[in-house]
Amino acid sequence: IKGQDSMFAKTALPLYFNSLSAAKASNDYTKPAEILSLIRAYQKKHGSEVLPSDSKISAEIAYNKINIFNRLFRYFTLFGVLMFIGIIIQIFKEGPLVNGFVKVCKIVIWSFFVAMTLGLIARWYISGHAPWTDAYESIIYVAWATVFFGLAFGRKSDLTVASTAFVAAIILWVANQNWLDPAISTLVPVLDSYWLMIHVAVIVASYGPFTLGMILGVTVLILMILTNGANKAKMDLNIKELTTINELALTVGLVMLTIGNFLGGQWANESWGRYWGWDPKETWALISIMIYAFVIHMRLVPGLRGKWIYNVASIAAYGSIMMTYFGVNFYLTGLHSYASGDVPVTPSFVYYLVAFLVVLAIISYVFYRKHYIKKG
């Protein structure tokens, strides 16, 4: 840029801010508006290739006003809890009113999934790249994948849909904490690859089935605690159903995680000239694969068979996914930690959540022994 263009680039902003100060005193904003229009014309002349179009600007303004993912965590919480309460009432006393209520909740949760999908499409259109490139986007993508698999596996299981809605609310709540930046930004150069569409989409989406398996494990333990002599037959049927769906979810998740890991090796070879380098993300992805392979095959070990131990294992195994994602991105140094850019933090609720799960496992085992283990 030479001559007048160079001078304009150097002086435009200081001149604009000075004119704003003067306009504030005189209440006449004609001059700042003129300078702003000149800046806009200059940007279009020299930066038209990178400037967003008017339609994208309008779309981003609408997206920010709607703030769909911030709203959805509240909606998912409300209808997930309401649906779960309705299902518990169904177990004890079924009737047309409660059946209709549960069906309405299920339809509403489906509509929330459509809204999530539209929100991701909007981010994709506005940014010009796949919406799973930073910490915030990857979390909302995990939430989307969790709801997708929850609705797919729970077509005939209302408890699965209710559990999915509840865990989606938790994920979206985490995404909207102040230590994550929801701003739509440009793509990090190392992610500017077609592998973003393939590797990242597959491996991050695999966290969805694992998350579903975790929340189904929690739901099964709660059902065990709610079991009594009068409802044992219905509870046993629901526990078997959720455990079967849990096994299916973990199997799908393991397949996706394994495929995603191999695809990551291909990308690593193109980017860094090696397929495997024991980077923290690579290592923990491998650890997660081994842990979930063990959990899925526990039923083949006589001493590790049983619905209680399987569901507890599906909850505990999720810790490896948390380490693979949050631990590596926020705490460890490696080639994959560029994606976060945030200050490492361990929210206090994590410790309370772990304590709650331990207590839940212990109490549920007492009821499991009482109602489901045959006494010899």
Q: What residue spans do the PLM features occupy?
A:
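Soluble extramembrane regions of membrane proteins in the secretory/endomembrane system
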Residues: I1-A62
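Cytosolic-side membrane-insertion boundary helix
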Residues: L51-V81
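Hydrophobic cores of alpha-helical transmembrane segments in multi-pass integral membrane proteins
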Residues: F69-E94, V102-H129, T133-S185, W195-I225, ...
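Interhelical loops and loop-helix junctions of multi-pass membrane transporters/channels
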Residues: V188-D192
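Membrane-interface interhelical connector segments
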Residues: L226-L242
